[in-house]
Amino acid sequence: MAAVPTRESLPYRDCVGIVVFNQEGDVLIGKRKASGDPEKSAQQGAPWQMPQGGIDKGEDPLRAALRELHEETNITTVSLLAEAPEWIYYDLPDDMVGVALKGKYRGQRQRWFAFAFTGKDGEIDVDTPGGGKHKAEFDAWRWEKLTRVPALIVPFKKAAYDKVVDAFGDIPQRFTHS
């Protein structure tokens, strides 16, 4: 019987997080689909989050952000606004270490990017992103105030989302005071 790995023995998974602002300065959030995955199951009480995903080996983080955004939402019409000044980390809760994230990671190390959505809402497709080429990760989406998002996500990601708000909190004013 294999021993359950300890938090200290596991690395962080390199990922990207994506903040998409619409013309009103609100951000895109998606409601996670229910599944048997322990991490996703833990999110059923607070299933909303912004798009995010893993960085492939050798992949540039900005390229990964654009790829993940398309794979999860079908969005391609964006322009880069900003990149968070540093990596943002979150740790899995103790009962999920060695189980969630395929049991290989203690949490995630995320590089966050902010984009302006320059398309129309009809471009957004979380049901069959990429024309059905990508597995749906969300079953609903909506626009929300950036400052409200940390209260809508799972508690173990809240501190990371607070840092995202700190990094990009001035961006909504660019839309409302330009």
Please name every model-derived segment.
Residues 2-50, 62:
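N-terminal strand-loop-strand
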Residues 5, 20, 133, 155, ...:
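N-terminal non-cleavable signal-anchor helices
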Residues 12, 61, 157, 161:
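Hydrophobic (often cysteine-bearing) scaffold residues that line and stabilize catalytic clefts
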Residues 23, 118, 166:
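Residue-level marker of positions within ordered structural domains that often coincide
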Residues 54-155:
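Unchanged
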Residues 146-178:
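Charged phosphate-binding loop/patch that engages nucleotide di/tri-phosphates or the phosphate backbone
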